[in-house]
């Protein structure tokens, strides 16, 4: 045993070589547990580690995979454009809350509302969402409305993230 993550109850095992590791994964692990060697694209422990380490590129790739796997019937309602953007905002809010991260949606500032603010011990993520727009438009809104200003007195690193969701993909 090389390590243990008490938060998720995960042990990190070390193997002397690839042959021993493959034997463990293929033969012993399935025999003693109901765990398969396959991992889902949205493995919650890895997602949390990416967020907490500031690896926003990796966690957004993981989210993109997660959203691509969402059945289209559960997304759009009476106002498809607005409902779709709200769907993505709600899913992100729920995911971040479920993993125990401090998350706020529609965070009010003196110049508008930030779609989502996510805070960890080291980072603050300011996220603005666009549907069928561009990430650049979302970033421009963060800048023009001064969404980072309320956090300027905080010593944590601030990430400004513009996110575009496509209703086509």
Named regions from a protein language model:
Residues 135, 148-169:
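Nucleic-acid nuclease catalytic cores
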């Amino acid at each position: 045993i090389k390590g243990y993550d008490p938060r998720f109850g995960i042990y990190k095992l070390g193997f002397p070589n690839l042959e021993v590791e493959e034997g463990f994964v293929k033969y012993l692990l399935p025999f003693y547990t109901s765990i398969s060697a396959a991992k889902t694209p949205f493995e919650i422990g890895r997602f949390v580690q990416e967020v907490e380490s500031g690896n926003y590129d990796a966690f957004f790739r993981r989210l993109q995979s997660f959203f691509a796997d969402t059945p289209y019937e559960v997304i759009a309602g009476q106002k498809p454009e607005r409902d779709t953007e709200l769907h993505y905002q709600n899913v992100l809010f729920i995911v971040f809350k479920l993993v125990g991260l401090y998350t706020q949606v529609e965070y009010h500032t003196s110049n508008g509302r930030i779609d989502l603010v996510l805070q960890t011990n080291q980072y603050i993520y300011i996220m603005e969402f666009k549907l069928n727009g561009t990430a650049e438009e979302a970033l421009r809104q963060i800048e023009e409305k001064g969404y980072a200003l309320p956090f300027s007195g905080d010593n944590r690193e601030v990430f400004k993230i513009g996110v575009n969701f496509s209703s086509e993909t």
